[in-house]
Amino acid sequence: MILCRGLFMAVIGIDLGTTNSCVAVMEGGDAKAIENSEGARTTPSIVAFTDSEVLVGDPAKRQATTNAKNTIYASKRLIGRRYQDTRDIKTSYDIVSAKNGDAWIKVRDKDYSPSQIGALILEKMKETAERHLGCKVEKAVITVPAYFDDAQRQATKDAGKIAGLDVIRIINEPTAAALAYGLNKSDKQKVIAVYDLGGGTFDVSILEIADGVFEVKSTNGDTMLGGEDFDHAIMEYLMDDFKKSTGIDLHSDAMAMQRIKEAAEKAKIELSSRMETDINLPFLSSDSTGPKHLSLKLTRATFENLVSDLVKRTIEPCKKALKDAGISADKIDEVVLVGGMTRVPKIIQTVKEFFGKEPHKGVNPDEVVAIGAAIQGGILAGDVRDVLLLDVTPLSLGIETLGGVFTPLIERNTTIPTKKSQVFSTAEDGQTAVTIKVFQGERKMANDNKLLGQFSLEGIPPAPRGMPQIEVTFDIDANGIVHVSAKDKASGKEQAIRIQSSGGLTDDEIQNMIKEAESKAEEDEKRKKFVEVKNNAENLVHSTEKSLKEHGDKISNADKLDIENAIRDLKDCISKDNIEDTDTMQNKLDHLMKVSMKLGEALYSNTNNATAGDNNTTDTGSSSNSDGSKVVDSDYQEIDKKDGK
């Protein structure tokens, strides 16, 4: 496939979501979401490992019930996280601790990093864009929740790299939504709130939009609050009801759990437009008395009662975001709803009550983030002009100082990119080395915040404590990714690193995963070719057998035997179902097509003979000339050309 050039030097925008993902691209000055191979503009963020292949999106979702243990969903909740921080996450698949303490996913006998799973979804998005554009895509802008920390942002960028993408920018989801909302609006200056409740995370951002400048004033959120939690609340309700009526606890039954999860998600969606819904799951389990079924009505009122605490949890981040922006709720001109969960009536009502105004519903909550990412891609590519985006860092960044105190160097909601330095000194006499521990968070004590990483500055000349001057510099790039350096002013010794936490993927691991992904792509292409050849072979066998049965008497016995032998050989090859036999199967298919042409020739010959026989029949209403040619008599009417009649 050729590389996109000229007008199609495309930078795609990807919303890598917890529940669904979406890809968009700029076309003719407008950003549009692209349909995938299944005809939908959103793709389930689900990856399934079967015996023979890896499935992504709708095909993975369709087989989840029968392959629950090997079907991975909501992996975004694990990306860039430590195993100890994920113990409350309930899934049908196994979450394990990697050697470095990160949360990874176990499938059969192999462990996968969440970045690898994310890469498979990103590959699907990349393929969707390439199919639409008709050329190869390399560059992308990928969105992340505004409240993602450095490790989560870096892990997302790693996922893009594994997928074969050059991630030229990581952009916050609410900011992307604001870009999509306000790009072509010529209104006066506006202050908007973006309320983004997705499948796995919640963000709220306050932005000021004026004359093409999109300035984020503050952001807040909860990276463990989203639609998955609403689904889980319904699931627990259904399983409690089932246990009360049957005495059976379904928590350890992976297949039953998957069926309940699907039913819970379906019920949640239906209750956005209906007051009640029926949930029927026959043969959900069984005991010595026979099969057990689940059947009940779930009303909107019951659902709202189940999730009331989850809805309330979105309010505190809204309060904090307004406070940090120095704005009261009544000064917000418009509230933009983003994320599929904002279709829930209780959410809409809560937002309306808190902000005191009807929320704006003019954007598609499932596509707006990807569209905003595509616009940002257009800005970076120079296709979209006169637009300036000023984003912020969501959490304070600093280091651990004497007594375990957290000393921030860059406060939360500081506009990025940014750079700040501060001078520190030693805590002991004669100290020749210092360890710089970098943290992110809002707590007063360092250990209560997220440790991003650490490094040492050595070779400091011995001196009384407090005398050496060590300058620590924090640099946050436009992706929100942190770079830190420390320099001893006396000796000039300097140590600089891009923060990589004690977890995270090393460069070698990323390269190995890239090679594995490329290898998988080759295997997938090989599998695809085999399936296509096999399908063609089965179709040809079926049609040839049918033709032979109906018209075999019209060819010689020798030709008939050749066809029968070719059919048998191809059937034998098909029955082996061996991917290594693809070329052999193609050759046998070609041979059957060649020998079966005798059958086609005989059919056409018989048809032509029949037609010739018909032509010897005397026609009525015709006469012959002396040379034997036919003259067809016909009625005619003369037209007076002058009158035009």
From Swiss-Prot:
InterPro entries documented for this protein: ATPase_NBD, Chaperone_DnaK, Heat_shock_70_CS, HSP70_C_sf, HSP70_peptide-bd_sf, Hsp_70_fam
Keywords: ATP-binding, Chaperone, Nucleotide-binding, Phosphoprotein, Stress response
Superkingdom: Bacteria
GO molecular function terms listed in the Swiss-Prot or TrEMBL record: ATP binding; ATP-dependent protein folding chaperone; unfolded protein binding
PTM annotation (Phosphothreonine): residues: T201
Pfam families xref list: HSP70
Regions of compositional bias (Basic and acidic residues) in chain numbering: 630-645
Compositionally biased region (Low complexity): 606-629
Induction profile: By stress conditions e.g. heat shock.
Region of interest: Disordered: 606-645
Family: Belongs to the heat shock protein 70 family.
Stated role: Acts as a chaperone.
Protein name, entry field: Chaperone protein DnaK
Species per Swiss-Prot/TrEMBL record: Ehrlichia ruminantium (strain Gardel)
Organism classification: Bacteria, Pseudomonadati, Pseudomonadota, Alphaproteobacteria, Rickettsiales
